[in-house]
Amino acid sequence: MEALVYTFLLVGTLGIIFFAIFFREPPKVPVKGKK
């Protein structure tokens, strides 16, 4: 079960950093068909 906790923490941290950068610097070019 430790692996599940570590994975959850890792995804959560990456998600927070991603959203922080995304909202801090809006993309200057429109992203289409890119996930």
Curated annotation (Swiss-Prot):
Gene Ontology CC terms: chloroplast thylakoid membrane; photosystem II reaction center
Subcellular location: Plastid, Chloroplast thylakoid membrane
Keyword field: Chloroplast, Membrane, Photosynthesis, Photosystem II, Plastid, Thylakoid, Transmembrane, Transmembrane helix
Topology relative to the membrane: Single-pass membrane protein
Chief location bin: plastid
SUPFAM superfamilies membership: Photosystem II reaction center protein T, PsbT
Membrane-crossing segments per the record: 3-23
Gene Ontology annotations of biological process type: photosynthesis
HAMAP family linked to this entry: PSII_PsbT
Family, per entry: Belongs to the PsbT family.
Assembly and oligomerization: PSII is composed of 1 copy each of membrane proteins PsbA, PsbB, PsbC, PsbD, PsbE, PsbF, PsbH, PsbI, PsbJ, PsbK, PsbL, PsbM, PsbT, PsbY, PsbZ, Psb30/Ycf12, at least 3 peripheral proteins of the oxygen-evolving complex and a large number of cofactors. It forms dimeric complexes.
Reported function: Found at the monomer-monomer interface of the photosystem II (PS II) dimer, plays a role in assembly and dimerization of PSII. PSII is a light-driven water plastoquinone oxidoreductase, using light energy to abstract electrons from H(2)O, generating a proton gradient subsequently used for ATP formation.
Name this polypeptide is given: Photosystem II reaction center protein T
